[in-house]
Curated annotation (Swiss-Prot):
Short name of one Pfam family: IreB
InterPro entries: IreB
Organism per entry: Geobacillus thermodenitrificans (strain NG80-2)
Domain of life: Bacteria
Record family assignment: Belongs to the UPF0297 family.
Protein's recorded name: UPF0297 protein GTNG_2488
Coiled-coil zones: none
């Protein structure tokens, strides 16, 4: 059986986050909204492309979001979404 036929597992190291992902995302969201952008579109653009130009410097949002790996941001968003779906 080739390696393409097997499911790969992705493991995140269980270590405390230096930067609170939720706080960063909320700060970035607020900064985008204050500048008149659609926050969801801009954050998705950043997550898909990795291009920090989607995030403004306002409120230091660009610097904050770049301190967190994109895969960590996506992991937190997926966890939050799925936990909300299970409760609702």
């Amino acid at each position: 059986m080739s390696s393409f036929d097997q499911t790969m597992q992705f493991h995140f190291p269980e270590e405390p986050a230096e930067t609170n992902v939720r706080e960063v995302l909320l700060t970035v969201y607020d900064a985008l909204q204050e500048k008149g952008y659609n926050p969801i579109n801009q954050i998705v653009g950043y997550l898909l492309s990795g291009d920090p130009a989607y995030i403004p410097r306002h409120k230091d949002a660009r610097t904050l979001i770049r301190k967190i790996e994109r895969d960590e941001l996506i992991e937190e968003l997926v966890k939050f979404y799925l936990q909300g779906q299970r409760k609702g």
